[in-house]
Each structure stands twice: as structure tokens, then as C-alpha cells.
Amino acid sequence: MTYCYVCPHRCGVDRAETMNSPNGIFGSCGCGMQPIVARAALHMWEEPCISGTKGSGTVFFSGCNLHCAFCQNYEISCLNKGQEISVERLKEIYFDLIKQGAHNINLVTATHFTEAIIASLQEPLPVPVIYNTSGFETVDTIHRLKNKIQIWLPDLKYSDDLAAIKYSNAPNYFNTATTAIKTMYKQVGPYQIDENGLLKSGVIIRHLLLPNMLENTLRVMDWIADNFEPGQVLFSLMHQYIPCGRAAEYPEINRVVTAEEYQKVEQYLFNSGIEDGFVQEDTAASADFIPIFDGTGV
């Protein structure tokens, strides 16, 4: 690939040249072609069907095509903290995690390194591979990952496109993400859970409740209820928002979600027709659950 069109921004930047020239033009992700990883370790704080009893083999990539103002992983997603590695090293990391007992390999924010991901998964792994994404994906990229990804873990951050532009620089986010999610579902079908309660394949749609944005969340749940039947996808309502990154620049989101806000959303969910999924407790809204990006496992 000479010019990059891997994500919906379609920057058209020569990312190989970007990293070789001090005056190179950076795309939205701010990265070259070689993967940059900030942490690779067993992670116990994903959904129970992902973390299981031994942990999810989570690989945190640096850089991102969204740069959400409130990102909890801001130092790696926006400041690109991490270590550049080869595709061969990336493959080694997968097997290092599997040897540690990982139930799966969990690729966090890997979209801009799709070429490296495809190269690293030429041979199938003995555990499921999870693609942990913002949801801001192209149909073409999803198609290219067919048979390499068993579990799609997209966010559906916004039903409100103005909010998507304001906080994440993601124009047309809702249509883009919902089209991507439908494509993911067509690729892997209804979710499958094994005898140990671990997810073997399928789609989990995540949504993070933001302060002062109840309608945004309700419309997300409406879309899921309208487009999927029980038994098809899992929904994960996340209650872990704390102001991070540049959230202080936006007073309306520079606070935690109130108990009243969460209760309204939770009640709406229980009446929505969505039957399969997870709800986080309010104790999840803590900086204690943010990983330390110190190069562990890289």
C-alpha cells in the first residue's frame, strides 16, 4: 500500500514516507506503517466471556484514527507513546500471551496497522482473535480481515453525528459505524459461547455512557434493538467514564456520569428488547482500571 485509505478518513497519505522524512505529512492516525505497541499483557477487566478466568491477551496499539477528547488511553492513542516493532515480533507477542494462558488475542485500536495485522495472522492462531475497535471502519478493511478475526468488538460511540465531530473528529460516524457493524455480523454470524462461558466468535457492541448525553445513548440502543434479534449480538453498556485526555476543554463532559443518568439508561435498556449482554457497575468508573502503558510485554 502506497497511499493509505484503510479507515474512513481516507487520508491518502504515504505513511511509509511519513516516517522516513522529517517533513512527512501525517494522516489522522499520526503513524507510519510499522506497528507501535504500548503494552501486551493478560487483561482481566474485559467482559466476562472475553477475560474468563485467565485473562484476555491484550495488545494495545499506539495511535488512533479518532483521537477522542476524553480517551482513557490518551497517552497512547493521541500522544503515540509506545515502541515500534516488526511483524515478526508481533507474532511472537501473540504466542507469548498464549503461553501465559490467554483465552484469546485482543487487538486494541489496530485499524491503522491493518497491513501488519493481516501479515501477522497469515497462519491461524489456536485461540480466537478479537478486533477491538472504535467502530469507525470501512467495509473494505473488514472484508480484508475475513477469516483472520473471529470476534468483533466495536464501539458504537455516537448516534449524534455533531457530538462525533466535536469530540472525536469523526464525520458521519453513526452511518459509518452501523454499516461496519452490520458487515462484521454478516462475516461471523450469531455469537457462540463455549462450555466454559468464553466467546468463540461473534460481535459484542460496546457503548460508553457519556455525561449530559442520554439521548445519544438511547438512540444507540434503539438502533441495536431494531437491527438485531436476541441471540445475534451481545451489547455491553459501559459505565467507566471518567474525564481523561482533553475532557477539561469541554465542561459538559468534564465530570463522571451521575447515578440518576445511569439509572435512566439502565431502565431504558431493560425495556428495550435487548436481551443479551453486559452492564457495568458504577465502580468501573475509576482510574484504577486504566492500564499502565510502560511497554510491558513488548
Predicted regions span which residues?
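N-terminal [4Fe-4S]-dependent radical SAM core
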Residues: M1-N65, A69, N73-C78, I292-T296
